[in-house]
């Protein structure tokens, strides 16, 4: 009880301090809001919104158990739904993983153990961000992005295996398949419109976290002499990777690895928001610390086998990306998302 009261008091105090800082530095807050909104339109929404729609459609139908059985056995999962969710998480990223864990566990389609393993195995950055943005744009080599993406999945597997050695919850529960209730039948209204509506809500939640922590970072930076890399890495993963890549040399590569492992407060907030009762903070924290060491070791081991010289590890200044119009595909997707969001708001107001 005392711990709960202390947490509430700390949260109230932090909210009060943040409110004062926002009033004292409105320009910095506006700058953070603008950068967060631009990030959401340029990369977050194109990367996550389609995967949220696909996940809604796939989880509404029974999974292909026979096709998923090899992956299910390899990962030590009890239900084929969990194996399908892990595969989708590796493509969609941590937000998809948390959303699927919370939904499947909340509807009793997977056990507590499977929900925990889903978060540990599926909590990663998607290939669009790691390969395209981080490897191709920030680090300057697409091969490095592919290596980072594969290495972070391998680090997830290694960290989960280590936790299984010291945790009784890592052992399969034979009674789950017989004891769990039958999965509820999907509602009659389930389909593409409902999937899009749910994906809009999830995407707005993700964008809200990104914009909020961008504002917090901009405001704190205007008052405190905090190193930009430490602040951005602690708050938001994309800003942390951008600041790490700007350092050049080997610090760019291994700094990005550290940011990918520790995630940042924005990602932790999204995971807690979407996973609900399936959220396991202690196990996930230990897993991410182990992930940090495994990923650093794997990159040091594998980067020497890449063909050619390591161009990313140069001391040149960071690439300047000028502000310009969005690409046509990103602009079209952003327009469609805004239309869907406005339609949903109008529908909610009309129903009231």
Map each language-model feature to its residues:
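Transmembrane helix-loop junctions in multi-pass membrane proteins
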Residues: 23-34, 59-64, 132-134, 142, ...
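Membrane helical hairpin/interfacial module
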Residues: 38, 42-105
